[in-house]
C-alpha cells in the first residue's frame, strides 16, 4: 500500500493542503482513490492520454458561459478592440494558447517534465503565494526555453 508512488502522491497531497490548492487536493485524492480501488492500467492510460483534452474542454465551456448567458456580447468584443489593453489581451490569449499547444506536445514527448512542472507550481504557490496557472502553459514555456537552449548550442 505504501509504495514509492503512494508516498509521492501523499507528498503532493500535503503540499496541496499547505498551499490550500483545492484543484491539486482533489486531483491527488482522485488518483489515490483510483490506485486504492485498483483501477486497471487501461483506464489510467486513458485518463493520462485524454485527461488534458478533457480539462481543456471543461475550461472552454467555462469561458463560453458568459457568452451564453448574455454577459458578454458583440458590443463587448468590438469595444475590446478600442483599447491598448484589449489588443494586448488578444495577443496574450494567442500567445498562451500557442504555448499551451506546445506544452501538451512537450509533455507527451518528455513526461518527466510534468513532475518538475507540477512541483515547481506547487512550490511557487506555497513559497511565493503564486497562482497555479497550469502545467500545460508551464510546459509550453519550458518547451520554448529548451528550443532556445538547442538553438544556442
UniProtKB/Swiss-Prot annotation:
InterPro entries registered for this protein in UniProt: UPF0756_TM
Protein topology in the membrane: Multi-pass membrane protein
Cellular component terms per the entry's GO annotation: plasma membrane
Sections of the chain in a coiled coil: none
Chief site of localization: membrane
Pfam family, any one: DUF441
Membrane-spanning segments: 6-26, 54-74, 80-100, 117-137
Keywords: Cell membrane, Membrane, Transmembrane, Transmembrane helix
Keyword Cytoplasm appears in the UniProt entry: no
Family indicated by similarity: Belongs to the UPF0756 family.
UniProt-recorded name of the protein: UPF0756 membrane protein lin1603
Lineage: Bacteria, Bacillati, Bacillota, Bacilli, Bacillales
